[in-house]
Amino acid sequence: MSTAVHIVRSVAALRAQVGAWRDEGLSVALVPTMGALHAGHLSLVKRGLELADRAVASVFVNPTQFGPNEDFARYPRQEELDAAALSSAGCHLLFAPDVAEMYPEGFATTVSVSGVSDGLCGAVRPGHFAGVATVVTKLLLQCLPDVALFGEKDYQQLAVIRRFARDLDIPVRIEGVPTLREDDGLAMSSRNAYMTPEQRAIAPWLIRALTGIADGLRAGAKAADLCPMAVSGLLKAGFDSVDYIEVRDAASLAPAEILDRPLRILAAARLGKTRLIDNIGVEP
């Protein structure tokens, strides 16, 4: 039987526990989350336990990364279920601060990353990546783990985090973990719970569109021809709108046309009120 995860709610308590582990010579992995945990999140914890002696997960629904018309109010919050899931995954510590702990009165600092945060989700969700970068910077400095783990499903987010960690000399290894998928290929996401059964049946067309573009690139086609066809296909399949489908350089996220280097195909589309994102890599 797994031991129940220990829960702390203050930065001081988090630092005290991590400091005690450090005194024992133990290494620490951090998995930042917004809760509503699924198997994808738990795969990050399990990978963290392969890379370090102790695993810390944070659960904080970060208000600064939601736009004014987004789903902050209805984003699922289920701490008891999350704590049970983390316990079963072998996580040692859950950091679950409230908003006042993370953003005390007078808080006035924002971390913004130019370049990799431009375009894609950055164009559709202005301010989103500044909110992500600020809260993740805080979490990394609060915990100072040896390694922090993030899912590749949020590929642009991962690129933003890698960039600011490098630029700001934050001494933490940033580890990307491959996307976990449902049996029909849909990327696991806390927001999948928003979908009706009818929408859920349409959702796998997103990964099919991405794999179709990958096949086309391998056959020598250009992104400028493939991406508009994929958008049309998603709308025909029943998606309400497509924010973007783009082919980018896997490292820099600069726009790319042909398969002459490692690329990433990224998409965001909407089914009703649910916004789905996904991406896959393709190698020459």
UniProtKB/Swiss-Prot annotation:
GO BP terms, alphabetized: pantothenate biosynthetic process
Subcellular location as annotated: Cytoplasm
Listed GO MF terms: ATP binding; pantoate-beta-alanine ligase activity
InterPro entries, per database record: Cyt_trans-like, Pantoate_ligase, Pantoate_ligase_C, Rossmann-like_a/b/a_fold
Active site (record annotation): 41 (proton donor)
Other information: The reaction proceeds by a bi uni uni bi ping pong mechanism.
Task of the protein: Catalyzes the condensation of pantoate with beta-alanine in an ATP-dependent reaction via a pantoyl-adenylate intermediate.
Protein's name in the database: Pantothenate synthetase
Organism, as annotated: Paramagnetospirillum magneticum (strain ATCC 700264 / AMB-1)
